[in-house]
Amino acid sequence: MITSNQNSKIKLVRALLGRTKERREAGSFVAEGVRLVEEAAKGDWRFEIVLYDETLSERGRSQVEGLRLKGVDVEEVSASVMKSLSDTESPQGILAVLKFSQSPII
């Protein structure tokens, strides 16, 4: 379990949340919430990492297990770390770092 805000994965997420330049350079962005992570899993998105905490719903936990079985890097974090990363008032307990699609926009 990740409990420190100084962890390299936490620093990556914070950078992606904070600066457009970081997202562009990394080719990644952050999706937060059970529904967004679920939709990304159904789609053709490439996951870099999924972070979740103990407040995650049963539906979300099912999603985490499915992603773990697919070989996605899934990490549990403390509730305080998740709250520090969350962009919402009441975090849903899950977020994912996804790679931008390589498909050209027509």
Explain the meaning of each model-derived region.
Residues S28, E48-V50, D73-E75, Q92-A96:
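Structural motif
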Residues R14-K21, R68, S86-E89:
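Generic secondary-structure transition motif, activating predominantly at the C-termini of alpha-helices
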Residues M1-Q63:
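Boundary-proximal intrinsically disordered activation/regulatory segments immediately upstream
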Residues V34, E54, V77-A79, L98-F100:
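Fold-independent oxyanion-binding glycine-rich loops
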Residues G66-D87:
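A glycine-rich helix N-cap at a beta->alpha junction
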Residues V81-I106:
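Hydrophobic alpha-helical segments and helix pairs
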Residues R24, W45, L67-K70, E89-P91:
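A generic structural signal for short, non-catalytic loop/turn and secondary-structure boundary residues
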Residues D44, T55-D73, Q102-I106:
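Short, glycine- and charge-enriched coil/turn segments that flank and shape catalytic ligand pockets
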